[in-house]
Amino acid sequence: MIKSWKPQELSISYHQFTVFQKDSTPPVMDWTDEAIEKGYAAADGAISFEAQRNTKAFILFRLNSSETVNSYEKKVTVPFHVTENGIHIESIMSKRLSFDLPKGDYQLTCWTVPAEMSDLHADTYIIDAVSV
Amino acid sequence: MTTDIIKTILLVIVIIAAAAVGLIKGDFFSADQKTSQTKEYDETMAFPSDRYPETAKHIKDAINEGHSEVCTIDRDGAEERREQSLKDVPSKKGYDRDEWPMAMCKEGGEGASVEYISPADNRGAGSWVGHRLTDYPDGTKVLFTIQ
């Protein structure tokens, strides 16, 4: 299955946004110095990616996409398991975005594209989910 | 007669001593009275200073300086309030800028206290707060205390 969702706006706070299981609550993430160095933190079936700036950003979610990202500032890849169909993405006290990602194992890659490099003229986080 | 006088004197001494202890410990002006004085709130949040000491100190200092200890959740206005509160505080490499009241609170925005905090402390604190508040709707008033 190949799918790309349209970009959705998210207000970033505390330099992070979390990908977590549908119908659950984002867990407390322990942002150790090591996690900050790696650019992500993980807990309870969820992943929080570091965001460069606290501002309005776009989340572009893609499943098994073959499109490449040419201009980006940072790229982080982590394994992720979807326990039931569907995931959410939110930052701290932001609105909640939903994606109907099917149950299964994935490699999640988060590409950080700063506003000056983005066609959307705002910080953009492209998240590629690749089935494994 | 003499016994009654002694009893009365002892009673007065006990009352004065109790009042003095209460004043020293601050009991007369904390907890219940403060709660009823300050404000209305729907929920309370005991923020853990042992886990996020820098952020906790900032919250405590800001409240002592007169900033609100109650946060009225208002997600939609967060972006604008953050711009106002951070406009004169440049970013600094290796630090996050922590705001109190937080940008998601109606009480935040222009004039909010802003402090440079280590990212590990501040981002953990943000995650902790988000975990506890995420299900509260806009308009919920949360009283923060430092534990």
From Swiss-Prot, chain A:
Described purpose of this protein according to its UniProt entry: Plays a role in the competence of cells to be transformed. It inhibits the activity of the DNA-entry nuclease.
Its membrane topology: Peripheral membrane protein
Subcellular location field: Cell membrane
GO cellular component assignments: plasma membrane
Protein name per its UniProtKB record: DNA-entry nuclease inhibitor
Any one of the GO BP annotations: establishment of competence for transformation
Top-level lineage group: Bacteria
Subunit structure: This protein is a subunit of a 75 kDa protein complex, which governs binding and entry of donor DNA. The complex is a tetramer of two subunits of the DNA-entry nuclease and two subunits of a competence-specific protein. Only the complex is able to bind ds- and ss-DNA.
Keywords: Cell membrane, Competence, Membrane
Swiss-Prot record, chain B:
Organism: Bacillus subtilis (strain 168)
Keywords of the record: Cell membrane, Competence, Hydrolase, Manganese, Membrane, Nuclease, Transmembrane, Transmembrane helix
Annotated TM spans: 8-24
Keyword Ion transport (UniProt): no
One of the protein's GO biological processes: establishment of competence for transformation
Quaternary state and interactors: This protein is a subunit of a 75 kDa protein complex, which governs binding and entry of donor DNA. The complex is a tetramer of two subunits of the DNA-entry nuclease and two subunits of a competence-specific protein. Only the complex is able to bind ds- and ss-DNA.
The protein's name in its UniProt record: DNA-entry nuclease
Catalytic class of the enzyme: hydrolase
Cofactor(s) in the UniProt record: Mn(2+)
Physiological role: By degrading DNA that enters the cell, plays a role in the competence of cells to be transformed. Degrades both double-stranded, linear and covalently closed circular DNA.
Cross-referenced Pfam families: DNase_NucA_NucB (PF14040)
Top-level taxon of origin: Bacteria
Entry GO MF terms: nuclease activity
Comment on bound cofactor: Mn(2+) ion stimulates activity.
